[in-house]
C-alpha cells in the first residue's frame, strides 16, 4: 500500500492491490499483470495512470469554485527506500513509446534538465510532456543546482498557469500557455 501523510485509517486508504480483475479498463488490467501484488502493483498502477494522461490531450475537467479547467496530468511522487521495487514504474513508459515513435515528438523530459531546457522542450512540444525518473533524487538535486531551479515552473504547471522566459543574450522569448506536464518521480 502506498503510504499517506494524511491522518487516515488504513482501511480508508485506496488500496490498489485489492482491486479485482475487471474493475479497471482492460488495458490497465493487462498492464498490471506483470506486477506482483501489494506495493509493487500500486507503484505500477500509479505509473500507468500518470503516463496515460499524456494520451488524453483533449480531456478537460472543471474543479473548484470558481471553476478552474484542468487536464488529467498527474504530479506523482512515490516515496520508498532504495531497492524497494520502484523500477517497476518503467513499465508505465511502454504505453507512450508508440506515440514517440509514430509522431517523432519526445514525450519524456529528463528530470535533470535545466530550467531553460525544460521550457524549450515544453515550447517545442506544445506545452506537453512527462517528466519521469525512478529516483526522486534526480529531480531534487537538479532543483538545488543553480541551472535547475525551476520549482516555480513546477508550481505553475500544477495549476496549468502560463510559464514564460526571456533571455537577453539572444532576445529569446518563450511563453507556454496552459502547460500540461505530468511528473512521475
State the predicted function of each range.
Residues 1-185:
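Phosphate-handling catalytic cores of nucleic-acid transaction enzymes
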Amino acid at each position: 500500500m502506498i503510504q499517506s501523510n494524511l491522518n487516515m485509517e488504513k482501511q480508508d486508504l485506496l488500496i490498489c492491490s485489492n482491486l479485482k480483475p475487471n474493475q479497471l479498463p482492460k488495458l490497465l488490467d493487462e498492464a498490471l499483470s506483470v506486477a506482483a501484488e501489494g506495493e509493487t502493483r500500486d507503484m505500477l498502477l500509479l505509473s500507468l495512470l500518470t503516463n496515460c494522461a499524456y494520451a488524453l490531450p483533449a480531456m478537460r475537467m472543471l474543479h473548484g469554485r470558481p471553476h478552474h479547467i484542468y487536464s488529467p496530468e498527474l504530479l506523482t511522487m512515490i516515496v520508498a527506500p532504495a531497492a524497494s521495487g520502484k523500477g517497476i514504474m518503467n513499465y508505465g513508459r511502454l504505453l507512450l513509446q508508440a506515440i514517440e515513435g509514430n509522431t517523432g515528438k519526445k514525450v519524456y523530459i529528463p528530470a535533470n534538465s535545466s530550467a531553460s531546457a525544460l521550457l524549450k522542450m515544453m515550447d517545442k512540444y506544445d506545452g506537453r510532456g512527462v517528466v519521469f525518473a525512478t529516483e526522486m533524487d534526480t529531480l531534487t538535486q537538479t532543483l538545488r543546482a543553480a541551472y535547475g531551479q525551476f520549482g516555480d515552473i513546477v508550481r505553475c504547471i500544477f495549476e496549468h498557469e502560463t510559464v514564460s522566459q526571456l533571455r537577453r543574450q539572444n532576445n529569446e522569448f518563450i511563453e507556454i500557455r496552459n502547460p500540461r506536464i505530468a511528473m512521475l518521480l
